[in-house]
Regions:
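Loop/turn residues immediately N-terminal
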Residues: 12-15, 125-127
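Small-residue-rich
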Residues: 17-19
Length: 186
């Protein structure tokens, strides 16, 4: 059975779990320019061969030379589009660092013990409020991250779906980018 490598795509880097220490190591592509509201990995397309080379070399430092036997288990931002998911899969598979890719949005990976919850996350372009029931996304609402009011978002989260109006469901702040301090007081 193939071994998996856990990874998280954040707002500006890729976190890869080190097999020895169990800690996440950060891969940041050199010379990428931060562009508002555009995920950093979009720039990989401009220099795809170079980015794949640097990524493969980085992976060799953590997992050695036989990379193609692994499956990447990647947690992606909640606002990742289907087209972006395809690009992410192709980028990793074609970099000869894995044999397959499995993706899951952050909201679905956030909580394993609760059957119903609301996730609030902030990507490089959106704030995403998502109602999750039985480990599936039921309703998702997007807000512009530059103009959204945390008070409005928290109020909307409580009435995102009819289930939420009649029973108490926990709200989790998905703070993997460490950029949601204004929500932590709720």
């Amino acid at each position: 059975m193939a071994k998996t490598i856990p990874m998280i795509i954040t707002n500006n880097s890729i976190l890869i779990k080190d097999k020895e220490s169990g800690e996440f190591k950060t891969f940041t592509m050199p010379a990428l320019i931060e562009t508002p509201n555009i995920p950093f990995y979009h720039q990989f397309a401009e220099k795809i061969a170079e980015c794949q080379y640097y990524f493969k070399e980085f992976m060799k430092t953590i997992y050695g030379k036989k990379l193609s036997k692994y499956i990447f288990a990647i947690i992606v931002p909640d606002d990742t589009s289907r087209l972006e998911s395809i690009f992410i899969n192709e980028f990793f598979v074609n970099s000869d660092t894995c044999k397959a890719v499995a993706q899951m949005p952050m909201a679905l990976a956030l909580q394993k013990d609760e059957n119903k919850y609301v996730s609030i996350s902030k990507s490089s372009r959106n704030i995403v409020v998502e109602y999750v029931r039985n480990h599936e996304s039921v309703v998702t609402k997007y807000y512009d991250m530059t103009t959204a009011d945390p008070n409005v978002i928290m109020a909307d989260a409580a009435k995102l779906h009819i289930d939420l109006e009649y029973e108490s469901v926990p709200i989790f702040i998905n703070n993997y980018n460490m950029n949601m301090d204004e929500y932590l007081s709720f």
